[in-house]
Amino acid sequence: MTAIGSSAAKVDRYPNGVGLRMFVAADTAMGANAPTCVINYLDTAGGAGATTTFTSTASATIGNLLNTGAAANKYNPFLPLAAGDTGVSDIVSLVWSGTAHASGTVVIGLCKPLWTIPVPATGIYTKVDFVNALPSMRKIPDGANIQFLMFQTGATTSAGTVWVDFDYGYN
């Protein structure tokens, strides 16, 4: 793995990483086993030695977040940061502890959450107004790659349909 600071890739919008959060997704189908994943990262001051861990998901399919679930040492959807950290400025390493996955590759995602919309159960309609209610009119930087990161609760089902209608104003 090549650290962001050692490659051509740069965290250009948030150079010190304030507010950036991590998640780990399967880039290819993951094999059996559910090892512990240890990620070492640099905090917003560039300090080394910050780590976060989670128990991976055995046989996860492409696109699934490996750090989610209802079991112990799972987090939805973002990995916890070390005490006092407010973001991630660089990823240093990812190490599997214990019996590694039999196969597969992962992506460590760094993202800036703009808002969270709860979907408490399948079939429940949820609407959020970002003009007249809080959080009001979050700034979306030019060139941003807007994506929706969805994780299901125990009260939702994989057969449920999710529709998203996203309107925005440009200044």
Task: Give, region by region, the residue ranges found by the protein language model.
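Polar, enzyme-active/binding microenvironments
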Residues: 1-171
